[in-house]
Design a protein with these regions (language model features):
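Positively charged n-region of N-terminal signal peptides that target proteins for export
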Residues: 1-5
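Intrinsically disordered, low-complexity segments enriched in glycine/proline and serine/threonine
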Residues: 6-7, 142
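Intrinsically disordered, low-complexity segments enriched in polar/charged small residues
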Residues: 8-9, 23
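Bacterial N-terminal signal peptides
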Residues: 9-16
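Hydrophobic membrane-targeting alpha-helices
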Residues: 17-21
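A structural boundary/capping signal
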Residues: 22-283
Length: 283
């Protein structure tokens, strides 16, 4: 394949991915159906959402936003425990809690948890964080699975079979996941995706997810403090190369190799396309 054809292929793939992103964004809904009352909720270290919110605070988010986010997440978690306690299976529990989530937190994309939870909206991965806490509060365990541009739930059902739940369907009220749906569950060769992950893993990965929402100094600090296993994820590679002032020929070769597995990465595709254009190397 010539470089010109390769460049054209990258642009076509990026166009397709941009279309997927637009379709995801089009799910955004209006205001929440249930307004959460304001209280002076305290930080609760046992909840994943509260720990992630605190990480936002450590990265410069205003405390007024942090306080409201803590309040709203606690209200949801305790409401879910009260209203969904009669659920006899994890599936029933997810139907109940996700419906409640959709009422309190309509769908809207956000990299950081705090501004989203504080303003009563949520997206795919933020939904999972809320439901992990609600499940744990009710003595159940669920996990997150990352897909390209998406995240959903995995759990072991009452028959000891792994099952999957899509949190964003039905106006953010959820339904059983159909992994054959290529719109949500895009195919990729990278082994980071489609593996159940624990809340500890989420905490380790979260700084990468918010890196584009902080200043450049914090971004470098975030990358330098990542655990070695997280630095090997496709998202961390995107972060690493995005911080470089200039992509070298060696960088371009490495990005090209990474794209063989991480075929859905629009960041890597754009970096490589930019490199070829800048160097006038399209033949």
């Amino acid at each position: 394949m010539t470089k010109k054809l390769f460049l054209f292929s990258l642009l076509c793939i990026f166009s397709i991915i941009s279309t997927f992103s637009f379709m995801i964004n089009s799910k955004q809904k209006g205001s929440a159906e249930k307004i959460i009352p304001a209280t002076s909720t305290q930080y609760n270290n046992k909840w994943l959402t509260h720990r992630l919110i605190k990480m936002d605070y450590d990265n410069g988010t205003a405390f007024s936003v942090i306080q409201k986010a803590w309040n709203n997440t606690e209200h949801f978690i305790l409401s879910a425990r009260e209203k969904c306690q009669s659920a006899t299976t994890t599936l029933d529990f997810l139907y109940c809690t996700n419906a409640l989530l959709g009422d309190m937190f309509p769908y809207k994309e956000s990299n950081m948890v705090s501004p989203a939870y504080a303003s009563q909206f949520s997206d795919c991965d933020l939904n999972v964080y809320l439901l992990i806490d609600a499940a744990k509060e009710s003595g159940r365990q669920i996990e997150i699975i990352f897909a390209p541009f998406h995240a959903f739930i995995s759990y072991i059902d009452d028959n000891n079979v792994r099952a999957y739940w899509e949190t964003t369907a039905n106006n953010n009220k959820g339904t059983v996941a159909d992994l054959n749906d290529n719109h949500w569950y895009q195919k990729t060769f990278n082994k980071f995706y489609y593996v159940p992950r624990s809340e500890n893993y989420i905490e380790s990965l979260y700084p990468v997810l918010i890196a584009n929402s902080v200043d450049s100094a914090h971004k470098k600090e975030i990358y330098n403090n990542l655990k070695p296993e997280i630095k090997k994820t496709p998202l961390a590679y995107d972060l690493y190369y995005s911080m470089k002032n200039e992509i070298s020929s060696q960088d371009a070769e490495q990005i090209n190799l990474l794209l063989r597995e991480d075929i859905t990465s629009s960041d890597k595709q754009l970096l490589l396309t930019g490199y070829f254009i800048k160097n006038g190397n399209t033949e």
